[in-house]
Amino acid sequence: FFMKYKPYLMKDVMDTSAQNKFNVISLFAGGGGSSTGYRLAGGNVLCVNEFVEAARDTYRENYPYTKILSSDIKELTGQDFLDATALEAGELDILDGSPPCSAFSVAGKLSHSTAGKHSDGWGQTKNYSDGKMVENIEDLFFEFLRVAKEIQPKVIIGENVAGLTVGEAKQYFNKIQNTFEEIGYDVSAKVLDSRYFGVCQTRTRVFFI
C-alpha cells in the first residue's frame, strides 16, 4: 500500500473541510498537523486543546477560527469540550490525540540518561519554552483516555512514538490498550511509516484506533 505525496494549498484544506463529512476534537493539537489531515479528508475540526504557547500561536495562525482550550489537559474534563462545541456525549465522530512522547522516544530517553532505558525518562518534569512544566509526561495518554471516556466519541485515534512498543515501554503500550477496553472501546494498534501515507518523509509512529 502506498499513497503518493500530493502538494496542497490552504485553500484546498478549507474547501475540503467545508464538506463537513465528520466532526473532530483534537487534543495535544500542536501547530495543527493532524487537524490539517482531517480537514483535507473533509472533516470539520470543532475544537482543540494545546497547552504550549508557541504551538498554540502557530495553530491560531493556521486556523484562526477554531476554538482552542489552552489549559493543561489534567485540568480539563470531557464536559469542557462538549460545552465548547455544543455537543452531547456520544455525538462526536472522532477524538484525536497525540500526547507528548519524549518519555518513550529514543531521543527522549537518551536525553535523560546514557544507560538507554525507557524508565530513565519516566517520572520526570518536562519544561516547555514558555516556562510551563508538566510532571510525569508518560501519563498524558491516560489523561487523553479519561477525557475520551467522558466525551464518548464514535472513534478515538491516538498516536505516539514507535518506541512505545518495545522494551520497558511495552508495559505502557499494553496498559493503553487495556484502558481503551476498560472505557468501552475495541482497539487496534499498529506501527505505521508516514512515507507510505502521502507524507514526504520517513516517520514511524504507533497508532491506536
Language model feature labels by segment:
Residues F1-I209:
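Conserved active-site and SAM-binding loop architecture
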